[in-house]
Design a protein with these regions (language model features):
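Hydrophobic core segments of alpha-helical transmembrane domains in multi-pass membrane transport
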Residues: 17-30, 66, 116-120, 146-151, ...
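Cytosolic-side transmembrane-helix boundaries in multi-pass membrane proteins
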Residues: 1-30, 193-194, 213-216, 220-227, ...
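Alpha-helical transmembrane segments within multi-pass membrane transporters and channels
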Residues: 100-145, 291-294
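Transmembrane alpha-helical segments in multi-pass inner-membrane proteins
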Residues: 240, 251, 255-317
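Helix-loop-helix "hairpin" substructures at the membrane interface of multi-pass membrane proteins
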Residues: 108, 112-114, 122-123, 179-255
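Membrane-interfacial amphipathic/re-entrant helices at transmembrane-helix boundaries
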Residues: 1-62, 101-109
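Single transmembrane alpha-helix segments in multi-pass membrane proteins
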Residues: 28, 45-98, 131-136, 271, ...
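Transmembrane helix-bundle core of multi-pass membrane transporters
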Residues: 134, 138-201, 228-231, 250-260
């Protein structure tokens, strides 16, 4: 009876992501003194835990879009990191008026933000068209922007890092004056809530799962599978554009070589750790959120243990192997 109860608990969708996050946090508690200690400095919350929550914000946003892509198309969008770089470059180029560095906006801030989001969504639409209309494999289709994205960013910025040294630009990646909670975390929460409402209050969530499970059968019952897949990629592009804005705001610049670097792998891993099948179909936004925090907690832990940035991907790869093994049918039978 006891073994059956444990097996039922372990079979729950959120068991694996919660277990992984708890395991990483346990390691932090053992290795890092005062890990859960939180204090306020200059009106802003500080601490290891706050740093993880803050730094995971872009990944949480990306994971929302990636979850829909994986569920609808049984594929992944490996261009999200490059899309972040392009969106950041577009925003900063508009705000600087083409100059390398400014201390005052050349154009309205809202114009730069809207342009970045539109560009992100446009890249997502391009990917969605290739996958849904031309039936190109998702990884191959998104490989185009993965390869060309940073080159496009370099063209936009003339191969230089563009700086926007204006205090208001840093609010999106920092915090509002007098408000202790990091702005990126607030934005991430809003994206998660809005995505959840969109999928639960409309039939979109059901359609995405249906298309992911069986595209042909969905078409036969009247679901526009092509449009659903297209929409998933467009939304993923929009999320990437927003994440790019936050990343750019953190460093008040557009760095084509570093913004969004390796974020595509982290986003895919967050979705996988979240208990979502990479084969499409049913999905869990909550699982993806937990997966994103787990990845960021793991990254922060490795850096705290003085693991070099070159070696961090190796440890993440080990995690991928373990997660894939745990989700395999063979392990489930065992």
């Amino acid at each position: 009876m006891k073994n059956k109860t444990l097996k039922n608990i372990a079979s729950q969708r959120l068991f694996l992501p919660i277990f992984c996050l708890a395991l990483v946090l346990l390691v932090n508690i053992i290795t890092t003194p005062n890990f859960f200690s939180i204090e306020i400095r200059d009106g802003v919350l500080y601490g290891y835990l706050i740093d993880i929550i803050n730094r995971a914000s872009e990944l949480v946003i990306l994971a929302m879009g990636m979850t829909l892509v994986v569920s609808a198309s049984a594929g992944t969008d490996i261009s999200v990191g490059a899309t972040m770089a392009v969106s950041a470059a577009v925003c900063c180029n508009i705000l600087t008026g083409g100059e390398r560095a400014v201390t005052a906006y050349a154009n309205p801030l809202i114009l730069g933000f809207i342009a970045a989001l539109v560009v992100g969504a446009a890249i997502g639409c391009f990917n969605g068209f290739l996958v849904s209309r031309l039936n190109i494999q998702p990884m191959v289709a998104t490989l185009i922007m993965y390869t060309a994205g940073r080159g496009i960013s370099q063209l936009i910025t003339d191969g230089q890092i563009t700086y926007v040294r204006v205090d208001s630009y840093r609010i999106l990646g920092g915090s509002f004056p007098g408000f202790p909670v990091p702005t990126p975390f607030i934005v991430a929460v809003l994206v998660v809530v809005l995505t959840s409402l969109l999928l639960k209050k409309t039939a979109l969530g059901m359609y995405i799962q249906s298309v992911g499970i069986n595209k042909r059968a969905s078409q036969l019952v009247g679901i526009k599978s092509v449009f659903i897949i297209f929409l998933a990629y467009a939304y993923c592009g929009l999320c990437s554009g927003l994440a790019g804005l936050i990343a750019s705001s953190r460093i008040y610049s557009a760095d084509a070589n570093n913004i969004g670097l390796n974020m595509e792998m982290d986003a895919i891993l967050a979705v996988a750790i979240g208990g979502n099948s990479l084969g499409g179909g049913k999905f869990s936004l909550a699982g993806s959120v937990i997966g994103a925090f787990t990845i960021q907690a793991l990254t922060t832990t490795l850096y705290a243990m003085h693991v070099s940035s070159d070696q961090v991907p190796v440890y993440k790869a080990i995690v991928v192997v373990i997660i894939v093994a745990l989700q395999s049918p063979g392990f489930a039978r065992w």
